[in-house]
Each structure stands twice: as structure tokens, then as C-alpha cells.
């Protein structure tokens, strides 16, 4: 708060709560990939999306659930209880970014990040009534790189997703498939 009072916020997201899908490493936290089958070893470093969010001052409030290895279009996991759609708990939130979709729809905060190979951002968006974006492969650097997997924002409005893209699309040398830096006017996409 003192930084804001001085007019010196840490970055675009200083103090803004954010959730991150559990397959994106955050330093000191395990990365269970939605399954009870992997050992819970704390991550040594933040993956690029988590690093960019921290650098911008975001406050990470939770890791969000996903199905085992992200291989279902539901919130069913051997590690977590079943994720539910907050609009109708008899239904699922879609997946594999199930927890992020449910968290965004329930208003757990304004900013959430998930990943997508075959609909994992887009299904929760349509099933939970939120906005998400699966950017082009490499637009948001990710580590470890995986062909076809993209990280992307999950929000309740386009303007918040555009704000996240300004932060998440910054370069990171750990992703060999990252696209070259482009100065995209993400803020123009909320018009």
C-alpha cells in the first residue's frame, strides 16, 4: 500500500490477487499435476508465467485444480475433490483448467491463469461464463516447453485478460519455443 501512496507501484499488477493452475511451477510449492501419482516436491523456481506475475507485483493466493495430468475435460482428479461449476454445482466447470474457471466464475479474484492443449482454457470459459484466451504457441513463455501447450489468462472481462497479457507475454529464455518479443498494444483489445 505504501508504494501506491508514493505513486510507485511495483508493476501493473501490484497487489492484485491471482490464481495459477497447479501445472505451472511456483517456487517452494509442489506441482502435483492434478494426480496423486507424483511426489510432492517443492519447485526450485517459478515457471515463466509465475515469474512475470510476481515481477508485476501480483499476489498469488492459490494454485487451482486440474484433472490428472490435464487429460480430461472435467474437474475430476485423483488428488483433489471434484471441481464444480459455481453457477450450478451439479455440473462441472470444464477442463483441464477446471479450478481456474471455477475460481474466476465464483469471483475468487480478478486474474487467473490456466493452460491449454485441446480446450483446457476454452472449455471452462464457455461452461463457466468467463473470458479466456489461448494465445499462439510461444506467445506466453512456459517452462518446461511442450508442443501445443499454451498458458493463458482466465478472467471475468476482456480488459483484465488484456492487462494480464501485457505481463505474461514478456520474454523468458527458458522457453525455446517462445515467440520473439512484440510490442502488442494489448490494452487496445478491451475496446
Predicted regions and their residues:
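Short, hinge-like loop/turn segments at secondary-structure boundaries
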Residues: 78-81, 128-132
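Residues on a specific face of well-ordered alpha-helices
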Residues: 51, 98, 106-107, 111, ...
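Structural signature of FAD isoalloxazine-binding scaffolds in flavoprotein oxidoreductases
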Residues: 122-127
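Gly/Ser-rich catalytic/binding loops embedded in alpha/beta enzyme cores
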Residues: 1-117
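Flexible domain-boundary/linker segments
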Residues: 14, 70, 120, 177-182
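A short helix-breaking turn/cap at a secondary-structure junction
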Residues: 130, 134-191
Amino acid at each position: 500500500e505504501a508504494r501506491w501512496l508514493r505513486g510507485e507501484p511495483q508493476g501493473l499488477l501490484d497487489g492484485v490477487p491471482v490464481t495459477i493452475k497447479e501445472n505451472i511451477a511456483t517456487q517452494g510449492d509442489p506441482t502435483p499435476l492434478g494426480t496423486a501419482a507424483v511426489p510432492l516436491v517443492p519447485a526450485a523456481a517459478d515457471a515463466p508465467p509465475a515469474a512475470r506475475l510476481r515481477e508485476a507485483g501480483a499476489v498469488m493466493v492459490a494454485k487451482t485444480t486440474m484433472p490428472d495430468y490435464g487429460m480430461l475435460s472435467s474437474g475430476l482428479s485423483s488428488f483433489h475433490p471434484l471441481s464444480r461449476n459455481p453457477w450450478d454445482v451439479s455440473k462441472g466447470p470444464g477442463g483441464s483448467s477446471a479450478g481456474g474457471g471455477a475460481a474466476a466464475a465464483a469471483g475468487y479474484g480478478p486474474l487467473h491463469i490456466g493452460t491449454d492443449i485441446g480446450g483446457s482454457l476454452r472449455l471452462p470459459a464457455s461452461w463457466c461464463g468467463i473470458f479466456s484466451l489461448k494465445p499462439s504457441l510461444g506467445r506466453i513463455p512456459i517452462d518446461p516447453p511442450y508442443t501445443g501447450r499454451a498458458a493463458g489468462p482466465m478472467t471475468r472481462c476482456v480488459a483484465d485478460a488484456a492487462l494480464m497479457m501485457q505481463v505474461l507475454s514478456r520474454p523468458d529464455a527458458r522457453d525455446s519455443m517462445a515467440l520473439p518479443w512484440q510490442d502488442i498494444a494489448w490494452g487496445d483489445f478491451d475496446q
